[in-house]
């Protein structure tokens, strides 16, 4: 047996003491007092931050929404069926973040950026905070580039610019989503990343939208964020912010982005539900006092960045659903005051067969005219006025039996102008096509064509110009201007086709 000397024993003990490493993990832990209706009240968590992510024993994640004197009110991002009274809750020390990057393009994700399209995991390059601050005044630049929707009525009368917030408002089933989808389809050759956020919609409706985008090849540059009607209210509340964060990544990379929020009425209702369950005092229409801030902090994130920051942009098209055309309700007035204009869709026009059913009288674009293409600005300058005068005359003509020739001519022109603004769904038009039909309508070329033949004439004219006047198409498409040469070619083309049409 080998004898161990006493000094060796002391050396071994010293080495073991020195190599001993005691890891102390300090966790901010609380106890569940009450749980139900997608919310939980937690005792403890004295150090919790507002908006901090909390982790429950069953793996459910919540957000600390109410920080009260003796408890914390949290909203759950899951059903919470596994949470029990007395269970422990751990504060993570993190604020909600979502994965962002090129890997998300062409994918369908939930409000936390997790894939729900069955195409495997998303290997995102980085993450962004769900609630990111909006760009400041110095970081912005005034809107100066057009965001072509492909819808003649909008691009001619209510132009949208890159970095603008343009509200789409109307009753249910008036074609609000159709306008948004057409705008996404029209970005195919424009190098714009699109984000479609579906809030509180039926899963079948969202599937239909994704199917349409896939068929038209639009999913190649689109991200869909879906918080369906059966998802927890918390996910419906944060889904728009997730969409904005995904778009912001591309905006700060210098790219143009387009975000559709479909629709913010459902988000406000989800937030109202959470606030009432958290026992926050209700205000007008039972919405909480900060419901204006809910939408303003979201829509202020849309911007046209200065050249120093890369000149990227985020254009927002929020959608609001009204009840019986009441635009003076709480949420519609809030969002109208935040946005840079609104496109109002009328049920009466929709039912009368005018689609898109845009009411030009109360639809405005406050900053878009600065971004309108020169060709369209030159051609469509008096279109809105002519239509407004026609609406007044039409109402007056119902009571007058004998009208003078000038009034009859104006009524006839107005009816034809309405026809040229009709457009089938998922059929966006390029700038040169829009300029041609608006020019023909406003300059009297359609006055002697029967009203029911106007749509056929316009379709034929577009085909004729494409084949017989390629120089006109080239000038307007590349220079975005209607110079003397292009105008001459357009006049010749209209007259030539008119002879053949008759």
Curated annotation (Swiss-Prot):
Q: Which residues cross the membrane?
A: none
User: Which EC numbers does the record give?
Assistant: 7.1.2.2
GO MF annotation terms = ADP binding; ATP binding; proton-transporting ATP synthase activity, rotational mechanism
Membrane topology per the entry is: Peripheral membrane protein
Disulfide pairings? none
Q: Which enzyme class?
A: translocase
Q: What's its catalytic activity?
A: ATP + H2O + 4 H(+)(in) = ADP + phosphate + 5 H(+)(out)
In terms of superkingdom, the source organism counts as Bacteria
Q: Which InterPro entries match?
A: ATP_synth_asu-like_sf, ATP_synth_asu_C, ATP_synth_asu_C_sf, ATP_synth_F1_a_nt-bd_dom, ATP_synth_F1_asu, ATPase_a/bsu_AS, ATPase_F1/V1/A1_a/bsu_N, ATPase_F1/V1/A1_a/bsu_N_sf
Query: Which residues are marked as site: Required for activity?
Result: 363
Q: What is its main location?
A: membrane
One Gene Ontology term, aspect cellular component: plasma membrane-derived thylakoid membrane
Q: Where is the protein localized? A: Cellular thylakoid membrane
* Key words, A-Z: ATP synthesis, ATP-binding, CF(1), Hydrogen ion transport, Ion transport, Membrane, Nucleotide-binding, Thylakoid, Translocase, Transport
**Pfam families named in the record:** ATP-synt_ab (PF00006), ATP-synt_ab_C (PF00306), ATP-synt_ab_N (PF02874)
Residues binding ATP, per UniProt: 170-177
Oligomer status and interactors: F-type ATPases have 2 components, CF(1) - the catalytic core - and CF(0) - the membrane proton channel. CF(1) has five subunits: alpha(3), beta(3), gamma(1), delta(1), epsilon(1). CF(0) has four main subunits: a, b, b' and c.
HAMAP family cross-referenced by the UniProt entry:
ATP_synth_alpha_bact (MF_01346)
> What's this protein's family per the entry?
Belongs to the ATPase alpha/beta chains family.
Q: Which NCBIfam families match?
A: atpA, PRK13343.1
Instruction: List the PANTHER family hit by this protein, alphabetically.
Output: ATP SYNTHASE SUBUNIT ALPHA, MITOCHONDRIAL (PTHR48082:SF2)
Q: What does this protein do?
A: Produces ATP from ADP in the presence of a proton gradient across the membrane. The alpha chain is a regulatory subunit.
What is the recorded name of this protein?
ATP synthase subunit alpha
Classification of source organism:
Bacteria, Bacillati, Cyanobacteriota, Cyanophyceae, Oscillatoriophycideae
């Amino acid at each position: 047996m080998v004898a161990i000397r006493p000094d060796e024993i002391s050396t071994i003990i010293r080495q073991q003491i020195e190599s001993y490493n005691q890891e102390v993990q300090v966790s901010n832990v609380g106890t569940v007092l009450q749980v139900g209706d997608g919310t939980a009240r937690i005792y403890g968590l004295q150090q919790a931050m507002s908006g901090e992510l909390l982790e429950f024993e069953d793996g459910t994640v919540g957000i600390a929404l109410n920080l009260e004197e003796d408890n914390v009110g949290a909203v759950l991002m899951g059903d919470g069926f596994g949470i029990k009274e007395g269970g422990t809750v751990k504060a993570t020390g993190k604020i909600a973040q979502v994965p962002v990057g090129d890997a998300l393009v062409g994918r369908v994700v939930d409000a936390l950026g997790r894939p729900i399209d069955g195409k495997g995991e998303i290997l995102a390059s980085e993450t962004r905070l769900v609630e990111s601050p909006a760009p400041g005044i110095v970081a912005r630049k005034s809107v100066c580039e057009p965001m072509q929707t492909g819808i003649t009525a909008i691009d001619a009368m209510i132009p949208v610019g890159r970095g603008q917030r343009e509200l789409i408002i109307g009753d249910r089933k008036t074609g609000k989503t159709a306008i948004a989808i057409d705008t996404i389809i029209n970005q195919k050759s424009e190098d714009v990343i699109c984000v479609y956020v579906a809030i509180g919609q039926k899963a079948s409706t969202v599937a239909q939208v994704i199917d349409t985008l896939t068929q038209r090849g639009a999913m190649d540059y689109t991200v869909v964020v879906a918080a369906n009607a059966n998802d927890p209210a918390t996910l419906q509340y944060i889904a728009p912010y997730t969409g904005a964060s995904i778009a912001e990544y591309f905006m700060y990379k210098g790219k143009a982005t387009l975000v559709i929020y479909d629709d913010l009425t459902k988000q406000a209702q989800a937030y109202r539900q959470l606030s009432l369950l958290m026992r926050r005092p209700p205000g007008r229409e039972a919405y909480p006092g900060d419901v204006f801030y809910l939408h303003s902090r979201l829509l202020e994130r849309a911007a046209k960045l200065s050249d120093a920051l890369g000149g990227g942009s985020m254009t927002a098209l929020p959608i609001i659903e009204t009840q019986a055309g009441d635009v003076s309700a709480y949420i519609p007035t809030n969002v109208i005051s935040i946005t840079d204009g609104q496109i109002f869709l009328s049920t009466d026009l929709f039912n009368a067969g005018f689609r898109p059913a845009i009411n030009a009288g109360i639809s405005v674009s406050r900053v878009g005219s600065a971004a309108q293409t020169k060709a369209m600005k030159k051609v469509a300058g008096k279109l809105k006025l002519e239509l407004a005068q026609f609406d007044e005359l039409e109402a007056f003509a119902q009571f007058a039996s004998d009208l003078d020739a000038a009034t009859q001519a104006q009524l006839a022109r107005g009816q034809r102008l309405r026809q040229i603004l009709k457009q089938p769904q998922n059929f966006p038009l390029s700038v040169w096509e829009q300029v041609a039909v608006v020019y023909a309508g406003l300059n009297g070329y359609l006055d002697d064509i029967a009203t029911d033949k106007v749509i056929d004439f316009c379709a034929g004219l577009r085909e004729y110009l494409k084949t017989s006047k390629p120089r006109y198409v080239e000038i307007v498409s590349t220079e975005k201007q209607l110079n003397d040469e292009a105008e001459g070619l357009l006049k010749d083309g209209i007259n030539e086709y008119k002879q053949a049409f008759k």
